[in-house]
Regions:
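Reverse-transcriptase-like RNA-dependent polymerase core
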Residues: 52, 82-104, 113, 117-125, ...
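Nucleotidyl polymerases of mobile genetic elements and RNA viruses
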Residues: 174, 179-248
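Non-catalytic, polymerase-adjacent accessory regions of viral genome-replication enzymes
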Residues: 1-77
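Conserved catalytic palm subdomain of right-hand nucleotidyl-transferase polymerases, strongest
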Residues: 58-67, 109, 148-185
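Conserved small/polar residues in nucleotide/adenosyl-binding loops
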Residues: 249-255
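Short helix-interrupting loop/turn segments at helix-coil junctions
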Residues: 126-132, 191
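Short, conserved non-catalytic motifs in the polymerase core
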Residues: 56-69, 90-117, 133-145, 165-166, ...
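Generic recognition of stable, solvent-exposed alpha-helical segments in well-folded globular domains
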Residues: 12, 16, 30, 34, ...
Length: 255
């Protein structure tokens, strides 16, 4: 009996759950099912809370006026109950603006307390599934990667190059096509409840100047799950460019 309980505890541990997802992610033909039940594991929220609390920017109050430091076991239990019967509905994010380097303002969407906590659990799950399939040339919003690792790779790979072209996808986060994103997720995830939850986040809308606005496209900057969704979306572009570059090299070699 004690052995059975110990095994059950190990299998419930967030580390075990996420490592199991990562191991299966190596097989690109593997379809992930029954992901949604991970949200019923209280321990996932303890880990999520610790990770969020470690980042000062995540302490900003959402549209509900509450911060992540107001967590309690009762709140987690209520959240899990609403997830089990799928009555959970994310609140609209609070729109605020921060200055950009060019003097313009960048819109951010700050999620409500419960949404922030749940988004971190979603982010951990998606990272475990997708991180190893991302291209090595991708450095944004990834563990142990940054603009500094990108510059280091450029220095090593393009030592003889004198000119570089810098580009930006205008309004990228605001213009992500929801249906395309959902289609990409379904290539690896065969869990409709999990997909429906992602849709809820995408369609939650935002509040600005006390007015509600629908979100027909995009995923708000400032949302905890937004960066990983953006990387999943852009991974298709990375893989296309990798294949295109290989074709160019092949063509040059043939000439």
């Amino acid at each position: 009996m004690q052995i059975t309980e110990n095994v059950r505890d190990i299998m419930r541990s967030p580390e075990y759950v996420l490592n199991s997802l990562t191991e299966h992610s190596e097989n690109l033909n593997y379809k992930f099912e029954r992901l949604y039940r991970i949200f019923f594991n209280e321990e996932m929220y303890y880990v999520a809370y610790q990770r969020i609390y470690a980042k000062p920017g995540n302490m900003t109050a959402g549209a509900d006026g509450k911060t992540i430091d107001q967590m309690s076991l009762n709140r987690i239990e209520q959240l899990i109950t609403s997830l089990k019967d799928e009555s959970y509905q994310p609140q609209p994010s609070k729109r605020m603006y921060i200055p950009k380097k060019n003097g313009k303002m960048r819109p951010l969407g700050v999620p409500a307390f419960n949404d922030k906590l749940l988004q971190e659990v979603v982010r951990m799950i998606l990272e475990a599934i997708y991180e190893r399939q991302f291209e090595k040339t991708s450095h944004g919003f990834r563990p142990l990667r940054s603009c500094h690792t990108a510059l280091s790779d450029i220095q090593k790979t393009f030592s003889g190059v004198k000119w570089f072209v810098e580009g930006d996808i205008k309004g990228f986060f605001d213009n992500i096509n929801h249906e395309i994103l959902i289609g990409i997720l379904k290539e690896r995830i065969a869990d409709e409840r999990f997909i429906r939850l992602i849709r809820k986040f995408l369609n939650a809308g935002y509040i600005e100047d006390w007015n509600f606005h629908n979100s027909y496209s995009g995923t708000p900057q400032g949302g905890i799950v937004s960066p990983i969704l953006a990387n999943i979306y852009l991974d298709k572009l990375d893989k296309f460019m990798k294949e295109y570059t290989c074709l160019l090299y092949t063509s040059d070699a043939a000439d």
